[in-house]
Regions:
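Short, glycine/acidic-enriched loop or turn micro-motifs at the edges of active sites
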Residues: 93-95, 201, 238
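Active-site catalytic microenvironments for nucleophilic, acid-base chemistry
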Residues: 36, 182-186, 205, 221, ...
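N-terminal accessory regions of nucleic-acid-interacting proteins
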Residues: 1-84
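Acidic, divalent-metal-coordinating active-site segment for phosphoryl/phosphodiester hydrolysis
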Residues: 231-244
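Conserved non-catalytic scaffold segment of RNase H-like nuclease domains
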Residues: 72-76, 82-184, 190-193, 208-226, ...
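Conserved beta-strand -> loop -> alpha-helix junction used to position metal-binding or nucleic-acid-contacting
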Residues: 191-203
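Residues at alpha-helix termini
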Residues: 23, 39, 58, 136-137, ...
Length: 246
């Protein structure tokens, strides 16, 4: 059973099914999927449907219509920019690499129609100690997160907030990697299926003449205040305003 609508499976069977469907144009008979992916030769159609339904129930990218398995990737072009939601987010963590490091704070802002429409913020108990240099950088201490929810308690609320929005972050590779690592700890073999954008990459393409593309530099370029740098809520708000200006 799919744990949340905007999660996609990382299981070998499902990824093999998706690779097969991509290679044949997006759809294939259930019996062929079972034959190719599960190595069950000449399965009975009813048996093939049953096996395929198990895959479909675990991943929103797959569907079954009239014994044909279809790849149903979301069409982001079907919605105009005014209708599309963008969740601009930032994480603070116990270090630079996951694993072993963990998330200690999440800040996020929903941008719709060129304006901030909603916000999300939570400290997160990492279930491990916060290194002194991270406390010095962020101001977040072990005492501050001791009574905070663990990621497993924050995740359902954050996933609900994100919905089917496009995720945006400054250095998205880092933040998406950490976020998916934490999600994989809670929902084994799953990751976020949302499309993502990186404001570092966007600013490099749109602002080639700025000194560098660090958050503070781009914030200064657009006169966006960044008072409490290296806190997730403040960095996410500044990134959201930068994204709106870009």
């Amino acid at each position: 059973m799919l744990p949340h609508p905007n999660l996609v499976s990382e299981s070998l069977l499902i990824n093999s099914t998706i690779d097969l469907l991509i290679s044949v144009g997006g759809s294939a008979p259930a019996v062929e999927v079972v034959d190719y992916v599960m190595r069950i030769r000449d399965p009975h159609p009813d048996f093939a449907r049953m096996l395929v339904m198990d895959l479909i129930n675990r991943d929103p990218r797959l569907s079954l219509v009239d014994d044909l398995v279809h790849l149903t990737e979301p069409d982001h072009n079907a919605r105009g920019l005014e209708e599309m939601g963008f969740v601009v987010f930032d994480l603070e963590t116990t270090g630079a690499k996951a694993p072993p490091c963990r998330v200690i704070e999440i800040g996020a802002y929903l941008v719709r129609g060129g304006a901030i429409a909603a916000e999300f913020h939570s400290l997160v108990n990492p279930e491990t100690s916060i290194p002194p240099f991270i406390t010095a950088l962020t101001g977040i201490s072990d005492e501050m997160v001791a009574a905070s929810p663990v990621f497993g308690e924050v995740a359902p609320r954050f996933l609900e907030f994100v919905g089917d929005s496009v995720l945006v972050a400054h250095n998205a590779h880092f933040d998406m990697g950490f976020l998916n690592h934490e999600i994989g700890r809670i929902y084994e073999d799953y990751r976020l299926g949302n499309a993502s954008l990186c404001t570092v990459q966007l600013s490099r393409g749109l602002l080639p003449d700025v000194e560098n593309h660090k958050l503070k530099t781009i914030a200064n370029h657009f006169s966006v205040p960044l008072i409490n740098h290296h806190r997730a809520d403040e960095d996410a708000r500044a990134t959201a305003e930068i994204f709106i200006n870009l």
